[in-house]
Amino acid sequence: MTRRLLLVHAHPDDETITTGGTIARYLSEGAEVTVVTCTLGEEGEVMDPPYAQLVADQADQLGGYRIAELTRALAALSEPAGPVLRPRFLGGAGRWRDSGMAGTPAADHPRAFASADRIAADGPVALLAGIIRELRPQVVVTYDQVGGYGHPDHIAAHTVTTAAVDAAAASGLPGEQWAVAKLYWTVAGRGQIDRGVAAFAETELPGDWSVPESASLPAHDDAALTALIDTRDVAGRKVAALRAHATQLAVAPCGTAFALTNLIAQPVLTEEAYILVRGTAAPGPDGLERDLFAGLE
């Protein structure tokens, strides 16, 4: 069986922060991996001072620049001897715009992804269902129902992906129907976050970074996790991909921590956690799947 994995993310950098190790691991194992990004991240803040004027209320060129960052990040995640993973944008680059955080003026933009007409014939659900029918992935990954940390575009990506998985398996759309075998949410486990933050006590971080209370970082109870993917063998590729998103984040010299523009340290996880929400789990002796394709071959 040719293994095919589709990951749906809201903005450039989300693919690396939450699932970069998983992408790199499955590419190294020869799986067909596709990352669909729903917006260009136009409303992001900028960490790198030379590019600070690219933001939405100035030059409004950040989205185009982030295409280049995403391209470099996906190349970094790719197997050196294999094909280079390329970006794919839902509806094409620029079809939908970053909606910004809840309550900001960006939410009122006519192209804001969070308020897109999802049931339109050319809306995000139909377009993503078309991609699913085209690629025929056994496994699809997106966010949980709160989008990980509450960003409207992450919540919309969750809603759109869930509906698209249903639509791809049903009648009424062009193309041959396809039933996704397993749908996962990308999450972090509370234990992972607690251990990662505790390790900062012995980690040299940049002087202007702050160490958070572990409980302030979003995570799910460990008991809710259904899969843990070991990505230690490709950790260097994940770190390189994080560094490619230089307008959005910085990686500590040690490579085990990163910070967004708020300069709050977060651990670079070398196990990536998931919750299976559709399909049949095939856990190992510890009660967890160690392969997203477990039970399918």
UniProtKB/Swiss-Prot annotation:
Binding-site residues, Zn(2+): H11, D14, H154
Annotated keywords: Hydrolase, Metal-binding, Zinc
Keyword Ribosomal protein in annotation: no
SUPFAM superfamilies: LmbE-like
Superkingdom of this protein's organism: Bacteria
InterPro entries named in the record: GlcNAc_PI_deacetylase-related, LmbE-like_dom_sf, Mycothiol_biosynthesis_MshB
Entry-linked Pfam families: PIG-L
Broad EC category: hydrolase
Catalytic activity from the UniProt record: 1D-myo-inositol 2-acetamido-2-deoxy-alpha-D-glucopyranoside + H2O = 1D-myo-inositol 2-amino-2-deoxy-alpha-D-glucopyranoside + acetate
UniProt GO MF annotations: N-acetylglucosaminylinositol deacetylase activity; zinc ion binding
Cofactor section: Zn(2+)
EC nos: 3.5.1.103
Note on how the cofactor is bound: Binds 1 zinc ion per subunit.
GO biological process: mycothiol biosynthetic process
Signal peptide stretch: none
Biological role: Catalyzes the deacetylation of 1D-myo-inositol 2-acetamido-2-deoxy-alpha-D-glucopyranoside (GlcNAc-Ins) in the mycothiol biosynthesis pathway.
Protein family: Belongs to the MshB deacetylase family.
HAMAP family in alphabetical order: MshB
Protein name: 1D-myo-inositol 2-acetamido-2-deoxy-alpha-D-glucopyranoside deacetylase
